[in-house]
């Protein structure tokens, strides 16, 4: 009895993506008059972050991380934060990007061996809980007090946790922890799928993408960064949850577009455009156009939900209107920072690329070395 052979569809899809030139669209007009700013403490933060990077990572990796300029991303993300809180949030950014790269790169040992990745995720999550003072019986099994993690990357969470504990209440801390748990769980499901070689349908892709983006963990830091203390019934209001969803969708899709050249080049093709090409039979240009249109709709939805939320708060918590309005502005800063930094960072390699008259970036993957 002959056995059927499962063919990995990814090489054929990568070949298709490589053959068709496309352009990364100019998304700036969709954001209208959304605010942008750079935190005045950016120069000092850059120095502090460079020192931390050199202390945590080997020289070659450190040089690349310094070049990517995560201090600029953080300074645009939280332009109103005080210097000490901005530094803590930036150290979280650094941890998040480097932690994700440990597993997400298809050639890494942790990606290839999922049991090792699962252990890495488990130790990381339990150490997060330990550092934030919300450890449970599972955390106690690790005895981190006497046996800290061997990996400097995981261990570096201690500074972040200590500062958050001084500012956040238990509910705020648990929101942050739960979003990290959500992120790691989605990443695990995505890794399992990638290892099978199977390509997801659009709904399946989005189900994990909204977690692997890690956006909600960063949204959970906004109150810390900007000095807010918003009642939990507001933060769990359906409109606030919808607002978070739209922020997450915006960053996920815009990152999918802006990193597309890099992802195709490296064969990591689990993003919205390749999924649309695979699942719906679109051309690359059609898939890019559909993703662009959804980002436009997403921005419109965000503004509508923000207005509706403020109208509700005027009735239910009139004393909190200004604080919630400030939080919404912070979400706009977050999205603009993500977008503008992605256009210029060396991480995606778009900064020096030629734009056409409409601000689009023509891409020919075959010409990428």
Curated annotation (Swiss-Prot):
Ligand binding (Mg(2+) 1): 100
Signal peptide: none
Keyword RNA-binding: no
Ligand binding (Mg(2+) 2): 100
InterPro entries per UniProt: Isoprenoid_synthase_dom_sf, Terpene_cyclase-like_2
Record text on cofactor binding: Binds 3 Mg(2+) ions per subunit.
Ubl conjugation recorded as keyword: no
Binding-site positions, Mg(2+) 3: 248, 252, 256
GO BP annotation list: isoprenoid biosynthetic process
Motif (DDXXD motif): 100-104
Domain notes: The DDXX(D,E) motif is important for the catalytic activity, presumably through binding to Mg(2+). The conserved (N,D)D(L,I,V)X(S,T)XXXE motif is characteristic to type I terpene cyclases that form an allylic cation through the release of the pyrophosphate group.
Family to which this protein belongs: Belongs to the terpene synthase family.
Protein name per its UniProtKB record: Sesquiterpene cyclase hepA
Biological source species: Aspergillus oryzae (strain ATCC 42149 / RIB 40)
Gene name, Swiss-Prot/TrEMBL: hepA
